[in-house]
């Protein structure tokens, strides 16, 4: 009990005085473990200095008063007799008093007179004072124990008398025992007992007395509780309870051992090697250190040793760092081998020719202490170390052996101990004679060698002797070769054993080698260790493992020696052994070196190349080939690693072990991209191992439920149809097969799931080969038939039917025959894609045709009918009511099979199945819930975008056009039902007449460029682009080459079906002009940029036809009474609204004034445009809108296109690519990539826990994140985020209700570091939240509108922040979350009480909470239609999650709101906004400078300066600045992009990061960049080099203009009304797929508050339609902004809309209700009329060169761009 009490209170016994003493006890450069009895005086010299300077009395303490010091109560300390120590030999209190020993009190409080203490230990007096120091022993001791009669011979302790002795602290743990012993020994020394303490050898200076022994025993017992002693100490004390000195002796020995360990660690950590010494020497040094540590039970792993070695490599060896940097399984032997090879290679490179051996007389021997002075040549050998994970014995410092035995290492001889002599002649040695071998001449001191002794070498792996006198069982050597460190051969004469007879009669035997050419006889400790014999260099003895001493060893010079007297002579008389000649491999290069020098080439390749003299200066005989064929290069094994080879026919045993349908193979193929949603994207296949019967099932996704349904169906089918049970299913390791659902399904049905090994697809060959076969058939069938892609699974289904019916080359029966089924009835099969006519039993009218053209796909699974595809109805049907269409070729026509016909053959095969069309057709519905795998084909929904042609950029002279033969190619697509049969079926009638057509169109007019179409495009294009004659956007078809030459008289047009229309007479006012132009070459055209003569037709029309709507360009005030005027607002100010009042104060460019009401003909003086028509300069597609007369590239086909003519090659290369297996290269199609872009993926700006804390190398930043982490935890607990009263077990909670959590970290814009504990809402189950709830934030337009009104009305702007806003909202659902990591509750869950960040419902919950509080407690009302905008009579609030922006005329009103908020929420004032000077804000990323009554500036300079350089974009801060984000004339190449998968993902990620930041900036305030951002965003999935360069150019422009700001000035006070204006513009057909770009800019009182640039959702057919689309997009937002302005500011409002399209204005204002050109055009126009008249909207014309919305729709020249933007952003 006492020892336990002392242990608990020991840290505070000694207070500050103790700390002051121990702080000096070990100097900084002294190892604290290097303590022994011999150096204790020096060790304690400083530790007791303080004690010697302080005097204490028994009743006082020398410790300064310390509030941390707690003195234990004496009465509470029981005596130690109750412990486990034995109490024998203890003195009674009477004896103690008789011997004048003082009372032995509590150890830390003892008081004693000098040397008058008693060993007695009994209960102290409770009232006895307890000082904290012990007086030392100072008088001479009594008689020693057991030597009373020799008292005079015992040396007396003579020490300096000291006032106090610092007692040791109490032992607190078993691990601290070695440290505690140091203090205890010091305590004994200070108590004048240092001369009786044994050293590490167990030696003492004098014997201790009985009293001293009792004193040591009692103090040791008091300060070292028995239960805290190490095991080895307990074992000693259990034998002899008082043997404290033995414990101290072994402790001191362990200290010195630990000191050696520390030195070894330091040496290992500071290793350095640069090749200046031999690689063997370095290896031996390292191995010795590691072996020594291992002997001390410290194992150094190969990985750690390699890392320490690599750190110290330099010179030519430094490159090994990079080689081993990424290796995880590093072997020390491999690293040494690499170092040796580099060392050998450097040696060879320093020599001019292969070395030759010199005569032995030219060599000199050297000792260990003198360097080798010989200039011996180096000869490399086949030096290879076996790569083994087993520990190797330490190698000798001076030898290396090469043996046929695997256990003998091929080591080296150190030049310091082995002579380099070479025996030139064979000699014979008589083993029974005295040694007479010639000793080498050595340049060493005669005192270096100890005669008749063996040198003990701790690094030697073999024992070498110079004399055969001691060699037993000697045999001639023919296997072992020894070379020195210079690779010179050392002959070995014989191999035998050395027999030892040690002191105690112990005999042992070790293996030894005989050679006369060494300097010393070497004894290997490794060989001795194999016999359980070790050397103790501290006691200088050879010992057994049990501690038995066998023989002493002698230290002579620098080495340890063993006398030869322990060797037993051999007594062999005359046995002779032939000496061994030098190795045949001398002078030969090792194969590993040559293998490495020749780039790790194959063994046979190297050997053959040398035979053929392909490599000069090196012969085949110069290389050691002995082990070359079996040599394993580690680098080759890693770099050339391949999968194991599968043996052919290895699966035959499964066919013998299983019956049919018991062993199935399955695999999933997909996805197939760019298909309608109703078509499957995957299929799953099954193959029976025994019969090879195949099944395929379509899949729309790879979800668990879908896969499970298929497995249920196939198992039921096999069980019912074949009466078999599936036993094994083999599959790969895809997640669709390894999920828990499917595993449970297999387990319940007793099916064995057999998975392939990792990355071993060849083991799944049956299923993989089936998929490949089916896809090959699919591609072939679709290509041959020309059917659309969405029917791809029908082709797979047809192939499966055929493959099951045919005999494979390896089987004698088909799969159907193996399964016991009848053969395939050929009369029931039609060619895939065979044209047929299907009876329509339910026509729309009695007079409509009853037959519908279709294409046969495959026999039905569910009936005796056939699955037929009907393009006109966009669906497939299962019917028997069809007739094969005669004389209708399929795509075989393209192979010039015109002379072949299959009609007779088909009639003969299907004669008995042909019948009249009857009313028994069964139409398949997609929604039918059947098990048929063709249900997906029914009612396929296809988008109905109009067909658009693809043209080339070349312009050729019509006179040079030759008629091109037409290839009849059919691609049946969905066609309107009312189109004639000729438009649906493959037609041989193709127009061969080229067209000349104009596609140039601008709002100011254009020219018609002479061009021709490819014959394969003519008919389709004419039908699609037919227009009424005389319409403003007519395009004249020149259908005859001759008519182009002689004028436009009698022009003939061609319909789709090939019929002709009446001639169109040439207008008399139309003039044709031919011009010579420089045609702009396309990006794809690399042939020439020279001038070409191209006819440019300029058509000047003076009168328009009467069948089009009239264009009224007059504003309302100038129109006649025949025209209706829009409704005007009834207030007085509205009566004076004019175009000038609308245009007034707008930031328009300063140009020559032109009246906005100018009605002059805009088509006058139209300049001729000599360049070809292309898409937009930035983001447009080259050559997409221009007709060509040469081979044009066919764009990707859409599933909804009508019949078109395509090239077979392009069909196969582009449209079928999605059906090909995965490739190493990824092909990206521009159109598909653009259509695939849905939105810009946000780039992660936060850090995970491991990134912010665990692996963060920035300690300062790490500390800040740790601080933020603890702050977040405290806030979570403060807010009662979860229920802390109960923890729930994970197994008891529904997994759907469990939410994963994580910590995210980020650095805020103000520099503070923030941590946030969030829920993984991205994987939250849908049942745990209400999807109807919405998380609202303030719209950016609402914020900009509020800021604009604040500037005009001198409002105060206050910025607030609510800390942990979401945590104020309660959560309604029952959800559980995993605890934070610091709690350590991995298997527990917490019940959520608050809306944690990240949950789907948290945003909505917080919105409802704060909304309710603002309305009920702050008297606010939310503005209708604008979420998160609240107002009352004085204050307006814009809410963005936890940020609040307050606007008020009176600052006190803002303060009142703040006071109310603080009652409920932790509200921080970011910026109160008081004062009349300029105030700076950071509001939602916008850096705002605001001075009331004057101006407001909005920018992001600081943010962009920080973020842009981190994007890894090559910015040029000192170079020439860009003046525009892009230039006209740059075209994005539409060629497919071929790129590696990894590189593609990397570039897409880079595009997302760059465009994400640019989009954020653009929509905040840089509206001038929105066009470029929107266009590049469409190409995120097409990261070509060109797209990336344009993106870099945009980022560079943002960097150059990062200081630009959106400038607002206060509105003139004379303006009584608010004026809200939208400026609209459109660019016709300049985007991919002929889409138009539309843009709008919104201004409030002359201040730009928003902008929008986007691609039109529908394809417009003219410039006017595009402009109407742009206006229709602007009006709804204009009306919503108008409502917001009226709510926030009660002034009257004037709404205006400006456009530069006079035709659009005319259509809006016209009352003519004549039928429009098409339905879309008419509905849009009529809707605009209603919106303009119903919303009091003023529509006026703005000149194009003043239309600032022009920057939203197209790239502009630098001058124009600056002119349109410098008024509002600068």
From Swiss-Prot:
Domain of life where this protein originates: Eukaryota
Binding site for Mg(2+) 2: 1361, 1442-1443
Keyword Nuclease (UniProt): yes
Positions bound to Mg(2+) 3: 1625, 1667, 1700
Ranges where the RNase H Ty1/copia-type domain occurs: 1625-1767
Quaternary structure and partners: The capsid protein forms a homotrimer, from which the VLPs are assembled. The protease is a homodimer, whose active site consists of two apposed aspartic acid residues.
Gene Ontology BP terms: DNA integration; DNA recombination; proteolysis; transposition; viral translational frameshifting
Residue positions of motif Bipartite nuclear localization signal: 1193-1227
InterPro entries: DNA/RNA_pol_sf, Integrase_cat-core, PolX-like_BBD, Retrotran_Ty1/copia-like, RNaseH-like_sf, RNaseH_sf, RVT_2, TYA
Bias-annotated ranges (Low complexity): 369-381
Residues that bind Mg(2+) 1: 667, 732
EC number in record: 3.4.23.-, 2.7.7.49, 2.7.7.7, 3.1.26.4
Alphabetic keyword roster: Aspartyl protease, ATP-binding, Cytoplasm, DNA integration, DNA recombination, DNA-binding, DNA-directed DNA polymerase, Endonuclease, Hydrolase, Magnesium, Metal-binding, Multifunctional enzyme, Nuclease, Nucleotide-binding, Nucleotidyltransferase, Nucleus, Protease, RNA-binding, RNA-directed DNA polymerase, Transferase, Transposable element, Transposition, Viral release from host cell, Virion maturation, Zinc, Zinc-finger
Domain remark in the UniProt entry: The C-terminal RNA-binding region of CA is sufficient for all its nucleocapsid-like chaperone activities. Integrase core domain contains the D-x(n)-D-x(35)-E motif, named for the phylogenetically conserved glutamic acid and aspartic acid residues and the invariant 35 amino acid spacing between the second and third acidic residues. Each acidic residue of the D,D(35)E motif is independently essential for the 3'-processing and strand transfer activities of purified integrase protein.
Subcellular localization(s) per the UniProt record: Cytoplasm; Nucleus
A cellular-component GO term for this protein: nucleus
Span of domain Integrase catalytic: 656-831
Residue ranges of the region described as Integrase-type zinc finger-like: 579-636
GO molecular function, one term: RNA-directed DNA polymerase activity
Catalytically driven reaction(s): DNA(n) + a 2'-deoxyribonucleoside 5'-triphosphate = DNA(n+1) + diphosphate; Endonucleolytic cleavage to 5'-phosphomonoester
Gene3D superfamilies recorded: Ribonuclease H-like superfamily/Ribonuclease H (3.30.420.10)
Record bears the keyword Kinase: no
Post-translational modifications: Initially, virus-like particles (VLPs) are composed of the structural unprocessed proteins Gag and Gag-Pol, and also contain the host initiator methionine tRNA (tRNA(i)-Met) which serves as a primer for minus-strand DNA synthesis, and a dimer of genomic Ty RNA. Processing of the polyproteins occurs within the particle and proceeds by an ordered pathway, called maturation.
Species per Swiss-Prot/TrEMBL record: Saccharomyces cerevisiae (strain ATCC 204508 / S288c) (Baker's yeast)
Site (Cleavage): 397-398, 578-579, 1232-1233
Name assigned to this protein: Transposon Ty2-OR1 Gag-Pol polyprotein
Note: Retrotransposons are mobile genetic entities that are able to replicate via an RNA intermediate and a reverse transcription step. In contrast to retroviruses, retrotransposons are non-infectious, lack an envelope and remain intracellular. Ty2 retrotransposons belong to the copia elements (pseudoviridae).
